[in-house]
Curated annotation (Swiss-Prot):
Any one Gene Ontology cellular component term annotated for this protein: cytoplasm
Lineage of the species this protein comes from: Bacteria, Pseudomonadati, Pseudomonadota, Gammaproteobacteria, Pseudomonadales
Protein name (database record): Acetylglutamate kinase
Keywords: Amino-acid biosynthesis, Arginine biosynthesis, ATP-binding, Cytoplasm, Kinase, Nucleotide-binding, Transferase
One example of a Gene Ontology biological process annotation: arginine biosynthetic process via ornithine
Taxonomic source organism: Pseudomonas aeruginosa (strain ATCC 15692 / DSM 22644 / CIP 104116 / JCM 14847 / LMG 12228 / 1C / PRS 101 / PAO1)
């Protein structure tokens, strides 16, 4: 099939716009947190796999960290195990942790690996327990009301926070032309398993690798101002101001704090991108306009 003149011109424009970005990012590492709608639509899933394979083909090193909250919730429901959340975190007792490991490590992770490989990549699936990739400790959660003289410690079970990343393993895989796909399960000092927020794992992996970019796929268009307009480029100082004045609040706060910590920890830029947009990852990396919000220590994309 021959392209029309208009279609050919559009293809040429896209390729020429992408070329400077490809040159800039060759040999660089990009950590992508994959989740939300992008994991549910078959079209978006295929597009994500193609994006990752193309990045690797042009010399960029993608590392994928994935979520799987809805899939965990579905299996818990089928097993008649009730889900409880505190401050957005799933209370994870021993039975729930078994389900988390089954779903994230055994189902979701392998589905993503298989999808990338079917589109021409060489993906390898890992959990944080493999070669102690993600070392973790129990997350301490506290709560205090005006009536309390001291904070109350709340036990949320096998929920963890990252204490270390096996950078040597990831570098070995990346140099071997593999695409690491990581399930956010950490391992404690005694071999115990921890359920960790995927955004936090992605941020810590990006920091440890000194990645060029941390990309967080979400179900929103990006960070918005109080008028509902997407803020396309922000410095870390501007983000802190938006938190202070209440523009950023609620469920977005943990994600934004994760992005801020990554940039302050050595990642060149963090991106909050709309995973509902087909090929969102490529559009954010390889076009002038992008499809989300970029956070960096600089003012511009």
């Amino acid at each position: 099939m021959t392209l029309s003149r208009d279609d050919a011109a559009q293809v040429a424009k896209v390729l020429s716009e992408a070329l400077p970005y490809i040159r800039r990012f060759v040999g660089k590492t990009l950590v992508i947190k994959y989740g939300g709608n992008a994991m549910e639509s078959e079209e978006l899933k295929a597009g994500f796999a193609r994006d990752v394979v193309l990045m690797k083909a042009v010399g960029i090193n993608p590392v994928v960290v994935h979520g799987g909250g809805p899939q965990i919730g579905d299996l818990l429901k089928r097993l008649s195990i009730e889900s409880h959340f505190i401050d957005g975190m799933r209370v994870t007792d021993a039975a729930t942790m078994d389900v988390v490991e089954m779903v994230l490590g055994g189902q979701v992770n392998k589905d993503i690996v298989n999808l990338i490989n079917r589109h021409g990549g060489s993906a390898i699936g890992l959990t944080g327990k493999d070669a102690e990739l993600i070392r973790a400790k129990k997350l301490t959660v506290t709560r205090q009301t005006p009536e309390m003289t001291k904070p109350e410690i709340i036990d949320i079970g096998h929920v963890g926070e990252v204490t270390g990343v096996n950078v040597g393993l990831l570098n070995m895989l990346v140099k071997g032309d593999f695409i690491p796909v990581i399930a956010p399960i950490g391992v404690g000092s005694n071999g115990e398993s921890y359920n960790i927020n995927a955004d936090l794992v992605a941020g810590k992996v990006a920091e440890a690798l000194k990645a060029e970019k941390l990309m967080l796929l979400t179900n929103i268009a990006g960070l918005m101002d109080k008028q509902g307009q997407v803020l396309t480029g922000l410095s870390t100082e501007q983000v802190n101001e938006l938190i202070a004045d209440g523009t950023i609040y609620g469920g977005m706060l943990p994600k934004i704090r994760c992005a801020l910590e990554a940039v302050q920890g050595g990642v060149t830029s963090a991106h909050i991108i709309d995973g509902r947009v087909p090929n969102a990852v490529l559009l954010e990396i390889f076009t002038d306009s992008g499809v989300g919000t970029l956070i960096s220590n600089r003012k511009r994309h």
